[in-house]
């Protein structure tokens, strides 16, 4: 790896940009709106002007986190849309003025994994929650006005008017698509829809169970609906989620708080005469992964986990059940999607009125209101809140 810190030998003709950013300086404390400096892009990098950015629960998770991989001060945010302001050397995919989606999942197009249709896990830039640029060691493109380094987040850091990304994390898109809708495919909607469409490959007429009807679970429901699932059963502790879920294709609902003596899996197995074809765990609980696995049908059932539990959490499965029941358990990161291949396909499905994105956006606010938006997310009052830059 090279040292990519900005210095006087930077060959780019572009200069540092001074702009506003919402900086997370201490765990759980309100973000600080301040002016920062954004360095020019290095080779294979792109500097973009953010048009709008959306909030994701991953932002809240790392805003709260007090142990590694948390680090401060940091610029969070990873679901956004922007316009290319400048490019570093060796960047050929995009040019100044292109509309792009930043993605936390790299798609380098060069490694064995990116060239294979079997995986979306880039081996050249393995996914990790690093505070640095992915191509260069210990390298940030952000500093505050005192010269202190500000850390990156998930290869994106969209809570800033300008940000710098590796070209592996940028997807060029049609500029005519409404920004507040297109940005959703930068993370959340792609993750859920892709889990149903690409990871699980949900079949027409199948039965799907979704644990957790937050934004990701609702996106899974949307994906299952697009795939033609005949039954989409939502499981949640909040009964009001059923009414919301119905807009996304949820056909039935199980309130896990009112199952009395029966486990949720027992209720689901009775409802489905032996188990669902596909189960999705969207909460981030190892115990729910086990429950989802118990809900899926022997012989062909698939359990897909999308949530993240605390580090070190273990999933315990009976080895007899694993051997004799022939089920599949797998993880799905970014819905198994290759960003540069699949995002344009999803955008076309939006333009053809198949993929419904409008219903995900419940709030639109100014960037300066970001702390109010965080509160809405913490209180469960929004699905997706889009923040517009000035």
From Swiss-Prot:
Compartments in which it is found: Cytoplasm
UniProt catalytic activity: a primary alcohol + NAD(+) = an aldehyde + NADH + H(+); a secondary alcohol + NAD(+) = a ketone + NADH + H(+)
Protein keywords: Cytoplasm, Metal-binding, NAD, Oxidoreductase, Zinc
Entry binding sites for Zn(2+) 2: 108, 111, 114, 122
Free-text cofactor note: Binds 2 Zn(2+) ions per subunit.
Required cofactor names: Zn(2+)
Residues involved in NAD(+) binding: 58, 212-217, 236, 241, 306-308, 334, 384
Pfam families the record matches: ADH_N, ADH_zinc_N
Binding annotation for Zn(2+) 1: 56, 58, 78, 187
Protein name per its UniProtKB record: Alcohol dehydrogenase-like 7
């Amino acid at each position: 790896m090279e040292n990519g810190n900005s210095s006087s030998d930077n060959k780019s003709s572009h200069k540092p940009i001074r702009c506003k950013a919402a900086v997370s300086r201490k765990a759980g404390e309100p973000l600080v709106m301040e002016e920062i400096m954004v360095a020019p892009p290095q080779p294979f990098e792109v500097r973009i002007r953010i048009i709008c950015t959306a909030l994701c629960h991953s932002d809240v998770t790392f805003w709260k986190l007090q142990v590694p991989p948390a680090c401060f001060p940091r610029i969070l945010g990873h679901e956004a849309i922007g316009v290319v302001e400048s490019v570093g050397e060796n960047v050929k995919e995009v040019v100044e003025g292109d509309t792009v989606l930043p993605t936390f999942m790299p798609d380098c197009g060069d490694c064995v994994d990116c060239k294979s249709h079997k995986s979306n896990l880039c081996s050249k830039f393995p996914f990790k929650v690093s505070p640095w640029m992915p191509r260069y060691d210990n390298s940030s493109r952000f500093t505050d006005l005192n010269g202190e380094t500000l850390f990156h987040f998930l290869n994106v850091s969209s809570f800033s008017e300008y940000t710098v990304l590796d070209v592996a994390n940028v997807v060029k898109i049609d500029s005519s698509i409404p920004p507040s809708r297109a940005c959703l495919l930068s993370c959340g909607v792609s993750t859920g829809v892709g889990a149903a469409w690409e990871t699980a490959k949900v079949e027409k007429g199948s039965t799907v169970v979704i644990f957790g009807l937050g934004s990701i679970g609702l996106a899974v429901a949307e994906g299952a609906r697009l795939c033609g699932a005949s039954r989409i059963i939502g499981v949640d502790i909040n009964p009001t989620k059923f009414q919301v879920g119905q807009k996304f294709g949820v056909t039935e609902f199980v309130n896990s708080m009112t199952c009395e003596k029966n486990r949720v899996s027992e209720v689901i197995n009775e409802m489905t005469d032996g188990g669902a074809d596909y189960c999705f765990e969207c909460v981030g609980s190892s115990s729910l992964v086990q429950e989802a696995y118990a809900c899926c049908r022997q012989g062909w059932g698939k359990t897909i986990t999308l949530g993240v539990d605390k580090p070190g959490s273990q999933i315990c499965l009976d080895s007899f059940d694993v051997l004799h029941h022939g089920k599949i358990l797998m993880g799905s990161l970014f819905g198994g999607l290759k960003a540069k291949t699949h995002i344009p396909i999803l955008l076309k499905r939006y333009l053809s009125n198949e993929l419904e994105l409008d219903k995900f956006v419940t709030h639109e606010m100014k960037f300066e209101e970001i702390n109010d938006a965080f509160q809405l997310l913490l209180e469960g009052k929004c699905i997706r809140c889009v923040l517009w830059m000035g």
